[in-house]
Amino acid sequence: MRFPVLDGWRGLCALFVALFHFNASGHFYLVPFVRGSYLFVDFFFVLSGFVITHAYIHRLNSTADGGNFLVRRLGRVWPLHAATLIAFIPLEMVKALAISGETAAFTDRFAPSSILSNLFLVHSLGIEDGLTWNIPSWSISAEFLAYVTFAALCLLARRTWLVTVSAVALSATGAFVVMGWSDQYIDTSFDFGYFRCLYGFFTGHVAYRLFQATRGAGLLSRLPMRRPTVGSTIAGLSEGLSLAAVIIFVATARGNALSYASPLLFGLVVWVFAFEGGVISRLLAMRPFQWLGARSYSVYMVHALVIALYEKAAVATQRLSGQPMFVEQATDGAEDRLISFGATWMMDLLALAYLGTVVAVASLTYRFVEIPGQSSFSALLSKRRKPAVRPAAMEVT
């Protein structure tokens, strides 16, 4: 069983995270919902826990199963992670060859000393002093470590009910650490990112178990998307309320203690949309959203690289023309440098062009990096000639 509607959600969330990180002095930048869209990273964690539980909760019964699971998950996330990391190196080399630059090459965020922690996916454990190289990749580190935790939990607990009880404890532990030690509310990354992911991932596990229990008890079931019924009307109302709650929450929870509730709200939203019974589900199941959802991991992983290219183009234009291309602006108590070279509507067009570029590049990396990378790791498993669990019906990052 797949969850195409949740795939649609994933694609939209990836786009909003990409828009959140793009600093241009247009209307989009100041929209409260956009400023809070970093919270969709927690949606990814919850969604991942949900679908990984669906696919593997009864299939990790031996160390061989666990090893195969982790190899498949590594094949899902690592090739594109490594490719985007490597892609930043030529940009730093260009900076090193430039006559003058605002910062020295291969320093701070791009220090060579942080390459190994990135390659080994441990840069969400507080090893580094800040975000490094491809900034969004901290969450890939955190999520892969959550996969390891999930596999170990399934192998050690054995019984499904014990896995779920332990998942609740792990989710609570993650929440406790983030609430107790993060100085940015839930917006922790390189320092306590793993614990943030634990909170969301195992909330997703619980959401799936509730979904499973609800269906098993016959209280609710997945409804045919094209057959309006009383049930679909109720589902439509539930979906509408859930969507409204997400919009209001994301717009108001940024930068405050309310953000700690993000995984809980997103767990409820994932549970509601997993039944796929309302009109919003029918919309998200349409081909454009499915196409975007399939490429959401690439959208998420390449957008920082595209931003770097846009900013370098602005710097080069500023040097050649002598006209300022940036402006400093205080947002949410911090000074940000925004691309600014025309009217506000022009910056809105620039933001849309940026999103188009991100999607275009993501289409290429999906075809030439993601799919071949997964195939290579699957081939590696096949050569081992050992029974392997099947991959998740929907893969989430």
Which residues fall in each region the model found?
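Functional transmembrane helices that form membrane-embedded active or gating regions
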Residues: 2-14, 69-71, 75-78, 140-141, ...
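Interfacial loop-to-helix transition and helix-capping segments at the boundaries
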Residues: 3-4, 29-41, 106-108, 129-142, ...
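Specific transmembrane alpha-helix
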Residues: 40-57, 138-155, 171-226, 259-281, ...
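Membrane-interface helix-loop-helix regions
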Residues: 78-142, 175-182, 192, 199, ...
